[in-house]
UniProtKB/Swiss-Prot annotation:
Source species: Parasynechococcus marenigrum (strain WH8102)
Known function: Binds the lower part of the 30S subunit head. Binds mRNA in the 70S ribosome, positioning it for translation.
GO cellular component: cytosolic small ribosomal subunit
A Gene Ontology BP annotation from the UniProt entry: translation
Protein name: Small ribosomal subunit protein uS3
Length: 242
């Protein structure tokens, strides 16, 4: 069963958190859920070059809080926070309420090459540039290994290299224990649009096992060849406070 179900949905409340954190009545729930979907689609479409890994949405009374995990926070923040104001206006326009209070927090992804969505996005970009899929997968695996992940699985489906018959190819490096609920599995999907049709991309990244309230176990000497990474940036929007 662990190989069929969505790894994120299976681990909600165990090693994964909900992407939308709010409660609503049965009457307003569908509208708010569709609103979240529109916000995410708007952000990924307009700021695709920012390498946005995840969008977390929370609601408190009339306030909307949006947290963006990105590989390039400077693209979102802009000069003196001008990008944040533009993003806030875009979200207000998307939800159809210019007076809605929107608070935006931008968090930098610590290990870009160890993030499943960013890896899937990289693979999609390479495939759209007509790079051979085997070479693309090999390069993605090497990048993930340098980031120190414990295991990785990549699957690509469609008309690979322009073949007449669609097929599925996959590769796995290290451990990817999909049946272990305490395993921290980062899962993402992406679609690559090519001249021969669309290619489906799935990426599973095993980051360690979570025991109780402990952080995921990181392999010893995960990245000894790389110098110490700089502290991840975080921009917290306080423009709506007091």
């Amino acid at each position: 069963m662990g190989h069929k179900i969505n790894p994120t949905g299976l681990r909600l409340g165990i090693t994964q958190e909900h992407r939308s954190r709010w409660y609503a009545s049965s009457k307003s729930y569908p509208a708010l859920l569709q609103e979240d979907d529109r916000i995410r689609k708007f952000i990924h479409k307009k700021y695709g070059s920012a390498g946005i890994s995840d969008v977390l949405i929370a609601r408190k009374a009339d306030q909307l809080e949006v947290e963006l995990k990105t590989a390039r926070p400077g693209v979102l923040v802009g000069r003196q926070g001008s990008g944040i104001e533009e993003l806030r206006s875009g979200i207000q326009k998307t939800v159809g309420d210019r007076s809605r209070q929107v608070r935006i927090n931008v968090v930098e992804v610590e290990r870009v090459d160890g993030d499943a969505f960013l890896l899937a996005e990289y693979i999609a970009q390479q495939l759209e540039k007509r790079v051979a899929f085997r070479r693309t997968i090999r390069m993605a695996v090497q990048r993930a290994q340098r980031a120190g992940v414990l295991g990785l699985k990549i699957q690509v489906s469609g008309r690979l290299n322009g073949a007449e018959i669609a097929r599925t190819e996959w590769t796995r490096e290290g451990r990817v224990p999909l049946h272990t609920l305490r395993a921290d599995i980062d899962y993402a999907t992406k679609v690559a649009s090519t001249t021969y049709g669309v290619l489906g991309i799935k990426v599973w990244v095993f980051k360690g096992e979570v025991l109780g309230d402990e952080a995921p176990l990181i392999p010893v000497g995960a990245s000894p060849r790389r110098r110490a990474s700089r502290r991840p940036q975080q921009f917290e929007d306080r423009s709506n406070e007091g």
